Each structure stands twice: as structure tokens, then as C-alpha cells.
Design a protein with these regions (language model features):
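Detector for Asparagine
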Residues: 10, 15, 97-98, 104, ...
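Glycine- and charge-enriched low-complexity intrinsically disordered segments
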Residues: 107-153
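Short, intrinsically disordered/low-complexity patches at protein termini
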Residues: 101, 144-146, 157
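Feature for secretory/organellar precursors and membrane-associated catalytic proteins
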Residues: 28-34, 44-123
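Short, surface-exposed, charged/polar-biased interaction segments
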Residues: 39, 79, 94, 131, ...
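Short, positionally conserved secondary-structure boundary motifs
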Residues: 1-72, 151-186
Length: 186
């Protein structure tokens, strides 16, 4: 895993640099160049604490399961992981890599198999067969970012509880109307 280039705000805090989809193709090479990183949008989110953070725009549906998870266009913020050995099974990571078989930036749920073959197993939350599990060789992984938060434009769909409450409310309104009609003054 390589050292990352960061930018800082006026008070000396690390900015969160955003890598939008349009910039992801050049990120693998550009990430080591200060000018490239400074050309990307940067922002700050209160409450993240200390550390180096980077944001990436999500593309595709591989991490979308049952209408929950990560939607295309979501922004995921990850904290820099200095040692690849620190990848923990079952957590979501953003992996910057130079493997030929997959995108250079992938958002996946990972399994650490470094001691059993020198690979990180990358799993999609979407169970559709078009999003298969795949291994990433350790030598192909250039940056690791542990998922911390997401910014999304999607509002969660109502749960079954809301549907039941809405049905009860509708029934009450209908009963109220029927009761009004049955009273002698109406």
C-alpha cells in the first residue's frame, strides 16, 4: 500500500478529496501527483475525527442488495488503511488496484486471505451472478480505504411498519366518514 497525497484546509486539517466517476480512470496514476489531487473537489465533514479520508462516487449496482446499500451516484467516504493486513473480514472497503480483470477502484465487502494465498477476496452485496466474488492479489492493491459513511440522494423506502400504520390511518378515516354519515344530523 502506497503513501497517499492529501490536501489541507486553512487550519491545517486534511480535506476529504472527492474522486468523482469522471476522474476515476486517471486516479491510479494521478493519485501520487499533488497537482492531480489538488484539482479534485475537496470538502470536510464534522465528526469524522482524525485521519486521512477520501471520497469516491459509486458506479454500478454491485453493492446494492434488496434496495438497500450503495446506489449509483452515492458518495462513499473511506479512512485510509496503512497496512493491508488490517483489512477485517466482512467490512466494506474501497480498493484502488491495478489488476487487469476488474475496475481500478472497487467498493467491496472483503475477506482477508493474505495468510492463505496472498489475496483479498472481494464480495458484492448484490447476489446477482453478474457480480461475482473475485480475488485481488496483494501486489495489485495500491490503496485501501475503510468505508466510514455514505452521502446519498436516495431516501429509504417505507418499511412494512409504515405501510401498516398508513393502512390503519386510512381505515380510521373511512370509519370516521361512515360514522358521520350514520349520525342523524347528517
Amino acid at each position: 500500500v502506497r503513501t497517499v497525497v492529501t490536501t489541507v484546509d486553512n487550519s491545517g486539517k486534511d480535506n476529504i478529496v472527492l474522486v468523482p466517476i469522471k476522474a476515476q480512470a486517471g486516479y491510479l496514476v494521478g493519485a501520487q501527483q499533488e497537482e492531480y489531487i489538488e484539482s479534485l473537489p475537496a470538502f470536510w465533514i464534522p465528526g469524522l475525527g482524525h485521519g486521512s479520508f477520501r471520497a469516491f462516487e459509486v458506479s454500478g449496482y454491485s453493492m446494492l442488495a434488496d434496495r438497500t446499500g450503495f446506489f449509483p451516484g452515492d458518495i462513499v467516504v473511506g479512512e485510509y488503511v496503512e497496512k493491508i493486513e488490517d483489512i477485517r473480514d466482512g467490512f466494506v472497503y474501497i480498493l484502488v488496484n491495478n489488476a487487469q480483470e476488474v475496475d481500478n477502484i472497487v467498493l467491496k465487502r472483503c475477506l482477508n486471505y493474505l495468510d492463505k494465498g496472498g489475496v483479498i477476496i472481494c464480495k458484492s452485496d448484490n447476489k446477482d451472478p453478474q457480480y461475482p466474488t473475485f480475488p485481488l492479489q496483494v501486489e495489485n492493491i495500491k490503496e485501501v480505504w475503510k468505508f466510514k459513511i455514505k452521502l446519498t440522494r436516495q431516501s429509504p423506502e417505507p418499511s412494512g411498519l409504515y405501510e401498516r400504520i398508513n393502512a390503519l390511518e386510512r381505515d380510521m378515516v373511512l370509519m370516521k366518514e361512515q360514522l358521520k354519515k350514520s349520525l342523524p344530523n347528517n
